[in-house]
Each structure stands twice: as C-alpha cells, then as structure tokens.
Regions:
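Glycine-rich, histidine-containing beta strand-loop boundary motifs that form or position
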Residues: 65-67, 130
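Short, active-site-adjacent cap segments at secondary-structure transitions
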Residues: 32-34, 68-72, 134-138, 213
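Ligand-binding beta-strand-loop-alpha-helix segment within the catalytic cores
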Residues: 81-207
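N-terminal, well-ordered alpha-helical segments
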Residues: 49-52, 59, 69, 102, ...
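Glycine- and acidic-rich phosphate- and metal-coordinating loops
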Residues: 27, 131, 213
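N-terminal glycine-/serine-/threonine-rich phosphate-binding loop
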Residues: 18-64, 73-83, 92, 197-202
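Short, Lys/Arg-enriched N-terminal segments with co-localized hydrophobic residues
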Residues: 1-17
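Histidine- and/or cysteine-centered catalytic micro-motif in compact active-site loops
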Residues: 209-211
Length: 213
C-alpha cells in the first residue's frame, strides 16, 4: 500500500517480495500521485520504474489506485462549468470517478510502457480498465459520508461550500477542511471476468481506480 511518496514504499515492497515470484496487486494512494498534472506525471515515472523492477523479477502485476485529489478536481471543474452554463447539466460524481480512472490510468500506462520499452521489454501490454463496483444500496455509509475528496479549504471556504453547493465538509487531520462523500463497502467488481482475462494474457492491468465507480 502506497500512502506517501512513491519511491521508498515501492522499494521496500520490492525487497519484501523478491523471493516470491507470483501475481501481486499494488495499491497506489491517490495523494501519492500528486495534486496537479505535472506532479502526477513525475510521480508515475518513479512508480513505473519500481513496478517494472518487479516485472523483471518475474512477478505479474495488477495496479489499483486511489483518486481523492483527482476526482475532487474533476468534480469541481465540472460543477463550475454547470454554474457558468445553464444549459450544461450537473455531472454526477460517478462520471467524475470514471474520468479520474481514465486520467490516472492514461498517465500510468504511458509511464509503464515507456519504462518497459526502455528496458527492452516489448511483449507485455498495459491496459486501463474503467471499473464499476456493486454495493448494497442499504449500506449505512450512504448516510455517513466519510471519504475525503478534492483540495483542502479553510473553515470559511468549507462553510461557503456547504451553503452554496450542499457539500458535506469535514476537518481532515488538522490540515483544513475537505468535502466528504459516501464510501460504501464493495460487494463485487462488475468487470472482474474481463480483468481476469487480461491478467491471464500477461497484461499489466490498471483497475478499480478510486475503489471503482
């Protein structure tokens, strides 16, 4: 699990599994990918080197990732568009999650392809799978939003977001306020059979971004 900067956690992870050549899942924290496009592009280059190290050790890799900062950025941008253009309907958060999966997956798969080619590895494809998750509609998490998304705000900004947009805002570890959304427990992955097929065909699969849609 990567929750901080990408380089050291990935190095430690590699050292721990070097003697266990098997199929592994790597989870990249959304915060570790940065808050801007340049930060994300720099982070995925470091991450790609560590992942390809694992592949050279004989591991098959599936990559999952968070999306808190990224989906918040996308959601804010789409909400601003709706406010400026009355003919533009509001974009559901589910669609914003799909956008974030594609945005993060695009950078990750390009960084992985580049690193594979740099090492002369040409026979391992990389694919991003937009992934949906089944949940229980009665999950109490829908009544108690807890997943932070987007950027940090001051208390005054958070109060404005609550009043103007109906967001649920909570203080986040003394660093400021962030919007929180429901995070129900996953029941099953809709696209799991396709993911399994891709992995069995020796693809590096980037999937379940942000926990799925």
């Amino acid at each position: 699990l990567m929750t901080g900067g990408p380089e050291q956690p990935m190095r430690n992870f590699k050292e721990n599994i070097m003697d266990k050549k098997k199929r592994i899942v790597i989870a990249l924290g959304g915060n570790a990918l940065g808050n801007t496009l340049p930060e994300q592009m720099a982070a995925v280059k470091i991450t790609a080197k560590a992942i390809v190290d694992l592949i050279e050790e004989g591991c098959e890799v599936v990559v999952a990732h968070g999306n808190g900062p990224q989906v918040g950025m996308i959601n804010n941008a789409m909400a601003a568009l709706s406010r400026e253009n009355p003919n533009q309907p509001n974009t559901p958060l589910s669609v914003c999650v799909a956008m974030s999966q594609a945005y993060i997956g695009y950078d990750l798969q390009n960084a992985l392809r580049e690193e594979l080619l740099n090492r002369g590895i040409k026979d391992i494809p990389v694919a991003t799978m937009v992934t949906q998750i089944r949940v229980n509609e009665a999950d109490p998490a829908f009544q108690n939003p807890s997943k932070p998304i987007g950027h940090f705000m001051t208390k005054e900004q958070a109060l404005h977001a609550e009043e103007a947009y109906g967001y649920v805002m909570k203080e986040d570890a003394g660093r400021g306020y962030r919007r929180v959304v429901a995070s129900p427990n996953p029941v099953s992955i809709v696209e799991l059979p396709v993911i399994q097929q891709l992995v069995n065909l020796k693809n590096i699969v980037i999937t379940v971004g942000g926990g799925g849609i």
